């Protein structure tokens, strides 16, 4: 394994460890500070908008200065965010800190770190190993997040967890320092800005946005809020439940490699994702916390098989010089779309039903599966990825 990949995996480990507890703690912390369902939903939307802005902003610096400088800068913002969380009890400053630190409020990432890291991995390994490395990348992230989620049940208070966040942000910056001084794609002149795969990238971005919009209704933070509000599930129990969910998600990432090798990237993405969202809709009808959590676990066992396959697919259908643009555009679309739905979710929970977001989110995500397959089933890969 190359030094580039090792550094990226180390950074992913410490970052997602903190995301594992922050995704649970922040909505509960904001609730303790006086925000209701609509306020928490709006706060999550602002966090995602902050991630979208950072995702949009990193493309040009990455193309000009390389991955190391860009990623170290992003890690520096996480350090500032952790310090701000430690220093304030004002809800709007807590939200600002989460925006600056690109704090993930779901079980996965769609922001600037993912954008840059998947490009580094794509350039560091050949197409024949790309799906495997990206599966390992995501596997490490979910396993680390599972361990982080367990801290919610044993931590003496939110402040202790924010100190852990600060420490992991510093370690993340140090890991990025191990990257070569400049990892960037082939230089493009001002007259060579047109992307041959531009229409393809835009179609992918539009469909990924639909999927992400649906996913925004059922982010981990909002699912935790749902379980806490409807079934009175305590924070310690939520920590264990989501830790198990992260482990099951990690297993789904392991399954992605043999399935993609046998059936291809696109069929693997679509079928696994479709089945997982049928289970998601079923959570809305769960009569007890145990059944709801059980269905959540089944979904997590299937839901992320499409993640490394999707990342490998995006890198495989564009030219090397288009990879920053493809990663940035598709991840930006996902983040922006996901930013809209949490605010709607808060309103839907109050005005319609607490469980309605599961039906809305699952239905939209199933529509995405059908459209994705019909749109891209005849598109050929540019390299030898499978």
Task: Label every model-predicted segment.
Residues 53-66, 252-265, 349-350:
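Helix-to-loop junctions at the C-terminal end of transmembrane segments
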Residues 148, 166-186, 368-376:
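C-terminal membrane-cytosol helix-exit motif in multi-pass small-molecule transporters
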Residues 48-56, 145-146, 246-254, 335-339:
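Residue-level signature of mid-helix packing/kink "hotspots" within the transmembrane helices
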Residues 53-89:
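Conserved MFS/SLC helix-loop-helix module at the cytosolic interface between two early adjacent transmembrane helices
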Residues 132-153, 333-341:
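Glycine-rich segments within core transmembrane alpha-helices of 12-TM secondary carriers
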Residues 13, 81, 91-112, 291-305:
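Hydrophobic core of transmembrane alpha-helices in multi-pass small-molecule transporters
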Residues 69-84, 267-282, 362:
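Structural signature of the two symmetry-related core transmembrane helices
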Residues 1-49, 200-208, 212-243:
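Helix-loop boundary and gating motifs at the non-cytosolic
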């Amino acid at each position: 394994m190359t030094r580039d990949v090792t550094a990226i995996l180390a950074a992913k480990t410490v970052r997602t460890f903190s995301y594992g507890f922050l995704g649970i703690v922040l909505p509960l912390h904001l609730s303790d500070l006086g925000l209701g369902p609509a306020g928490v939903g709006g706060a999550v939307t602002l966090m995602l908008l902050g991630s979208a802005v950072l995702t949009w902003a990193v493309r040009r610096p990455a193309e000009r200065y390389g991955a190391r400088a860009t990623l170290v800068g992003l890690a520096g913002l996480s350090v500032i965010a952790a310090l701000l969380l430690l220093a304030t009890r004002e809800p709007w400053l807590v939200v600002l800190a989460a925006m600056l630190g690109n704090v993930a409020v779901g079980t996965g990432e769609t922001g600037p770190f993912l954008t840059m890291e998947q490009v580094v991995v794509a350039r560091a390994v050949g197409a024949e190993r790309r799906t495997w490395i990206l599966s390992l990348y995501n596997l490490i992230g979910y396993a680390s997040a599972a361990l982080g989620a367990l801290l919610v049940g044993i931590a003496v208070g939110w402040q202790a967890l924010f100190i852990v966040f600060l420490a992991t942000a510093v370690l993340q910056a140090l890991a990025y320092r191990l990257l070569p001084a400049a990892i960037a794609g082939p230089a493009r002149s001002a007259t060579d800005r047109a992307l041959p795969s531009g229409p393809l990238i835009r179609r992918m971005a539009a469909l990924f946005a639909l999927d992400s919009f649906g996913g925004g209704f059922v982010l981990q933070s909002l699912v935790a809020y749902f379980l806490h509000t409807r079934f009175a599930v305590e924070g310690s129990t939520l920590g264990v439940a989501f830790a198990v969910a992260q482990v099951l998600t990690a297993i789904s990432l392991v399954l992605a490699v043999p399935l993609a090798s046998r059936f291809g990237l696109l069929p693997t993405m679509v079928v696994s994702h479709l089945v997982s969202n049928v289970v998601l809709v079923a959570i809305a009808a769960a009569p007890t916390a145990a059944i709801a959590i059980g269905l959540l676990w089944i979904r997590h066992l299937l839901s992320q098989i499409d993640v490394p396959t999707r990342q490998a697919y995006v890198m495989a259908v564009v030219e090397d010089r288009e990879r920053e643009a493809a990663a940035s555009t598709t991840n930006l679309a996902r983040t922006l779309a996901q930013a809209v739905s949490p605010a709607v979710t808060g309103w839907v929970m109050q005005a319609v039903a607490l469980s309605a977001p599961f039906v809305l989110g699952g239905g939209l995500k199933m529509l995405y599966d059908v459209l994705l397959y019909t749109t891209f089933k005849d598109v050929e890969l540019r390299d030898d990825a499978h």
